[in-house]
Amino acid sequence: MKKGIFLYLSLLALSLSAQDNIQWRGTDRTGIYHETGLLKSWPENGPVLLWHYDGLGEGHSSVAIDSEKIYITGLTEGQGYIYVFDMNGKLLKKKEYGPDWNTNYIGPRGTVTVNEGKIYLISGLGDIYCFDQDNLNAVWKKSLLQEYNASNTEWGICEAPLIIDEKIIATPGGKEHNMVALNKNTGELIWSSPGEGDLSAYCSPLYISDQQVPIIVTMTADHIIGVNASTGEKLWSHENKNRYSVHANTPVYSNRMILCTSGYGRGSTMLRLTNGGKSIEQVWFSAELDNRIGSMVKVGDYAYGSGDSKRYWFCVDWNTGEIKFKEQGLAMGNIISDDAMLYCYTDRGDMALAKATPEKFDVVSKFPVTMGTEQHWAHPVIYKGVLYVRHGNTLMAYKVK
């Protein structure tokens, strides 16, 4: 009996682990990964490079991992491709899906989402795709901008599809059809929300399921909005403007509190859900905490990230907004966390490992990412003791356990 229980728990743990990275920034889009026994420091030249692949084409999307396969996108000569690798870096499949963003900072932006045998993708041109996971054949495709009378953004749509039960959520940014829920199997419209009628703002939405109503939270050009995930009803909004209408960071949620952060002259806003999620109140605001595109992570009672205007790395008390430290030394960048450590990938190409402590920005190791092309913007991913880093044309896998 004990052996049976142990086997069941072991299989369950493996199953949960295999599902950890099927979408943008992990299981629940928090950037928090759930492994143990990871290295607390790295050799001077960085952790062991297990493998790398140099033929992705351009792009800024991260990997998604499901059933021991790695999925990522890239752009070559104006055409977008999905790549599938095994865990040893062997290319299993490569399939063209159509044109993608080729105007500025070219290449796919949004990370794919894997769900129940399908792969979902929103291109920089605003096309939403559903592919069969096994053969990568297209199941359906919709043009979000054409079908919902929306305009593209200056730097291309950047959104990772959000799956909720039978629905796939996207933010075309139209006046009438600001956010939509489509049937994930057919692409047909389930509901449409006018939101505040803003343009889309490069934000991948967050799903909150522990309130009286299920809520989708995202940032559009001038607002933070909360939408009823079942009906599309706009529950609330909060004005949130910055210089270029860029709000690229997925909100962070914990215990009724939502942290939304943006650069370009904005900062961080902490909202609290009230009335079972049907309304909000502002808890605190800080103009100093102005993360541009690197996201933030919550570890314990503190949030960590980097700033835009002054290039600080900072720690803030989640509940009060008190800044615990703001330190320079690394260029600004993106951040994930695992096993009480912070993984900071800067836009100058340094990968740093720091302790998640409010006392100081304690960087214990770092190394330069020398392979790859163009901007260092793709967010890293951790899966089964391996750190996956994408730099333009190159995908790298480092052993961190």
Where do the language-model regions lie?
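Loop/turn-rich, solvent-exposed surfaces of beta-rich toroidal or solenoidal domains
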Residues: R266-G267, E288-A356
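Extracytoplasmic beta-rich repeat domains
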Residues: L50-A64, K94-T113, K141-I163, E176, ...
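Short loop/turn segments immediately following the C-termini of beta-strands
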Residues: G26-R29, L75-E77, G124, G173-G174, ...
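Short loop/turn segments that connect beta-strands within beta-propeller blades
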Residues: D86-K90, D132-L136, N183-T186, N228-G232, ...
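Blade/loop signatures of beta-propeller domains
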Residues: Q19-V48, T269
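Blade-level signature of beta-propeller repeat domains, shared across WD40, Kelch, NHL, RCC1
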Residues: T373-K401
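Short coil/turn segments that connect the beta-strands within blades of beta-propeller domains
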Residues: S67-E68, E116-G117, D165-E166, Q212-P214, ...
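Bacterial Sec-dependent N-terminal signal peptides
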Residues: M1-D20
